[in-house]
Each structure stands twice: as structure tokens, then as C-alpha cells.
Amino acid sequence: MWSSIGFQSSAHFPFILLSLIFTSCSEPSQTGKDQPKVPTLPPAPVTGRFAFQRMYIQARTWAPDVQPLRLSSFNLKQVASAAGKCGAWQAIFVSPQKSKARTYTFSVTESAGDVHEGVFAGREESWSGPRGQERPFFLQALKVDSDEAFAAAAQKSSDYIKKNADMAVFFLLELTPRFPNPAWRVIWGETIATSNYSVFVDASTGQYLQTLR
């Protein structure tokens, strides 16, 4: 009795297996269904410290003794800058051991003028020590972010901002003999040479320092 049933079951097994295969192939796959697409957010501007930290990490792989010399922003047409945040930033790092300097950029998107998304390292240049006014500074001295510097500068510039609401703003961070700590320079205008108004803010304390007209 058991052998007869077993034979009949084994005889029909290939047909049952084929039926299951064809059935599974004919049914639409659940994973193949169209999934709702997550909307892609447009690139947003970032603060100076956000960009600086990412450039610093890569600069350390170039030279463990790197020190920042300068941090500056530049505005992108496709990413609106706002309240101390910009679409792209540039930093210059120096290595006393290598006697070299190297420029890095960080951008939230690809842009004209050889601006690449993410961190991009430039070529090495010779550096034998401070030239001009700017000096390397310690990373720990950068405690105040660019948006905080803008807020401090804006408090001292309400009248100017009302009259020049649409004027571009960019940022420069450096250490010079003018002040004991690194200072943010919040600059209204397209370039330093053409600007008629800028405000210095201490990058370590957030204190207002000076207004240049």
C-alpha cells in the first residue's frame, strides 16, 4: 500500500514541480513593482566649519602636521548663499615639515571654474614660512562658525544691510597681526578690492572686532 502511494506520488512530482515553477514565473514579482521615488533635494549651502572639517581630514592624509592658513568662501550661481552659508569653500593648508602649501576646495555641487563636488585637492606649492600678513593658526582656535560670524556682523550692520539687501556676501578667515586670534571677515561685495564694507569677528570668541568702510 505504501509503495503504491509512494510510486504514484513520485510519478506526479515532476509535473507538480513544473507547475509550481511556471506559476511562480507568471506571477508578477513583488520586488519588481515600482517603488515610490524619494525626491532629490537641491544642493544646500553649508557653513565654513562644515566645509573646513572635511577639507582638513583630507589634508591630514597629505601631511599630518598641516596647519590652516586661510579659509574663504565663494558663491555659486546654482546654490544661493544665505546667512553665513555658501555653496563652496576654499582652504589653504601649510606643512612646515614638507615646506609646502596646498589648496583644497569643498563644494556641494559641480560648478563652472573647475569647482568639483565634495573635497578636491589642488597642487602642492613651495612654502618657506609666512609671507605678508597672514600666519598659520591652530585648528583649536576656530570655535566660531561662519553663520555665527554673520549674525554678529549683521547686528552691527543693520542700516547697511537695509540699503544693500541684495548685495553678495562672502567670508575670509585668517590670522594676521591686526588681531590676536583668527578672525572672520564678513565682506559685502564681489571682491575685497571692490567692497566698501566689511566686518571683523573674532573666530575664537565670536566678539565683534572692527568695521571697515
Question: Where are each of the predicted segments found?
Answer:
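Sec-dependent bacterial lipoprotein signal peptides
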Residues: 2-23
